Structures are given as structure tokens and as C-alpha cells.
Design a protein with these regions (language model features):
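P-loop NTPase Walker
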Residues: 1-85
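Accessory N-terminal region flanking or inserted into the helicase ATPase core
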Residues: 1-10, 18-19, 36, 109-188
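Residue-level preference for long, well-ordered alpha-helices that form the structural scaffold
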Residues: 16, 91-95, 154
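Short coil/turn linker and secondary-structure boundary residues
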Residues: 32, 69, 87-90, 153, ...
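Solvent-exposed, flexible loop/coil residues
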Residues: 78, 90-91, 179
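Conserved phosphoryl-transfer catalytic core
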Residues: 88-115
Length: 188
């Protein structure tokens, strides 16, 4: 757990944003500068809604709250990454050629945090999801494979893709979205 951090989880409409706004207000009333307050969420939609409500309530701008970001944007900016450092559609296409799987999709840039996220489809997408989930959860690959319960997938292919992905990222000095979070946590 991070010192001075609070984790707020819940389904849509349960008051997460309201609770966070109240906490931000309390900190501002204590004299904490807005640039010293961070709110992190999984989605750009949630952060966009939060920033809009916070700016409206406190009569401030988005620039006043530089640490209201998605998890990935926090890692991306915290690590000082540039677009060239991140696995792109072209990188996944090269990797797919090496592995004889498809990582189809397009790069889509978030308007809220400027991070380009490849949306994956194709025969390799499920494998990448399992690999990334293993990193996020800090769990073994075999656990995540079994958890998926997809009998159309091959564990040996999963291991091959993970190994090739790690090698490719190492040789090209690229990171993927799971790396952004994991590496940022390592230095934080």
C-alpha cells in the first residue's frame, strides 16, 4: 500500500466520485496545493468526469490538477516516456509475424492523457491479455492461463508469446501498458 493513499472501489453510481470530491475539498481546505493531490483511475472516462466535476466545484482548471490521471498515464508520464518508447501497432504486427499470430487493431490516443493505446484483436489478443493480467496481478502465467478457462488457447503458445514479447521489448527498448504500471511502481 502507498503511504497517504486511499483506495475507493465500487460499482457505477455508488458515490465514488462524490467521495473523492469531498476528500479533495478537505485537502484544499487544509491548504494543500492542487498540484500535490493525485487521483488515479482505470479509465479515461472516469478521470474525465472527475476532472470536470472537480474543476467546476473548485473553479480551477485541469492544469491545476496535474496528477488526476489514468493508471497508464501516471506510469507513462512518471517514467518520462515518449510515444516512440511504447509498443505500437507496427511493433505488434512485427511480433505477430515472428509468432504466426495476429495482433490486429489500431492505435487510439486518449484525448484525456495523450497515451496511445493499441486496441488488440486477432488470434494473439487473448494471449496478450493473459500476459498483461499476469503482470498486473503479479501472478504466475500458468495461474492466469487456468483462470481464463479458454480451452482454445495453448499454454505452450502463451509461454512462447511471453518469451518473444519480452525479448522484442528488450531489443527494441519498448514498453507495453503493463510495463508502464509495473516499472512506475518499481521506482515510486
Amino acid at each position: 500500500m502507498i503511504d497517504n493513499a486511499t483506495l475507493i472501489l465500487g460499482p457505477p453510481g455508488c458515490g465514488k466520485t462524490y467521495t473523492l470530491i469531498e476528500r479533495v475539498q478537505a485537502k484544499l481546505e487544509e491548504g494543500v496545493h492542487p498540484s500535490r493531490i493525485g487521483v488515479v483511475s482505470f479509465t479515461t472516462k472516469a478521470i474525465g468526469e472527475f476532472v470536470a466535476r472537480a474543476c467546476d466545484k473548485f473553479n480551477l482548471t485541469k492544469q491545476d490538477f496535474p496528477h488526476f490521471k489514468t493508471l497508464h498515464a501516471t506510469g507513462y508520464h512518471g517514467l518520462g516516456l515518449a510515444p516512440k518508447d511504447v509498443m505500437s501497432k507496427q511493433d505488434y504486427a512485427k511480433l505477430g509475424e515472428m509468432l504466426a499470430v495476429d495482433f490486429d487493431g489500431a492505435d487510439s490516443t486518449s484525448i484525456h492523457d495523450g497515451v496511445a493505446m493499441p486496441s488488440m484483436k486477432g488470434s494473439g489478443a487473448k494471449y496478450l491479455q493473459i500476459i498483461m493480467r499476469s503482470v498486473y496481478r503479479m501472478s504466475d502465467l500458468d495461474f492466469e492461463f487456468n483462470y481464463e478457462e479458454d480451452h482454445d488457447l495453448s499454454f505452450s503458445k502463451l509461454v512462447q508469446i511471453e518469451k518473444q514479447l519480452l525479448e522484442y521489448k528488450s531489443k527494441t527498448n519498448r514498453v507495453d501498458f503493463s510495463d508502464m504500471i509495473a516499472k512506475y511502481i518499481d521506482i515510486a
